[in-house]
Amino acid sequence: MTLFTVATLAEFRAYLGVETGADAPLLHALRAATAHIEHQTHRRLAPWLGERYADLLLHDQRECLLREELLALHACWDAFDQPIPLEELVLLYGSVLHRLDGVFPLRGGPIGAVRVLGIWGCHDDWAQAWRSTDDALSAPIDAATPTLSVADADGLDAALIAPRFSAGQLIRIEEEFCVVLSVDAAANTLHVQRGAHGTSAAAHAASTPIERYLPPAHHVQSCLRLAAFFYRQPLEEAAALPTDAPTPRPRL
């Protein structure tokens, strides 16, 4: 289970104009909003690494139809489990793989005839989807380390936006994805979910740069507005009740 949220806790606090208070109800609303958007759109809003099978197009066996949106192609195998050189494949419209050196061979049927390994997700500008945090690991970590030490947890990132780290954020250390669960700005430490979104937790040396994922701006705004509705709804209902009435539970 991922704890990624499309909008971060810091962005949500700024949106609500709330600087203090408990993190838990805010994160609960952000996670509910993220899950709701994914459920309604049938899309994953964060990148993830994995294998998926693609279906061969019988009217043109140079092409196969992907079942999800592909952001980056890592490897591909045909129906006979033979690797296909990546330079012979072109991604069209995010959902079709076109083969340049011939056709995809058919074996047993077109459904699931091609196996694809890559980064999947929903983003309209994958080339610009990651930005430097202007920070790095202050100490080496192994695959089991849940806490990362950094130079300045609430400093400016490469775009001069602060804080550079916030709960709900997806970060990348070399090839590993991590989700930030909480930030201790005083100690300059991050508590994270390691090996997130299909990647594997690995050892990383001190001074390894850390990047942050940038969801499309319209995804962030949709998440903020929906999370605000989820967050405020029980508060508004409670205000309308008699003082001795129990506080209603959120309807998500």
Residue ranges of each PLM-predicted region?
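Divalent metal-cofactor coordination and adjacent catalytic microenvironments
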Residues: M1-L252
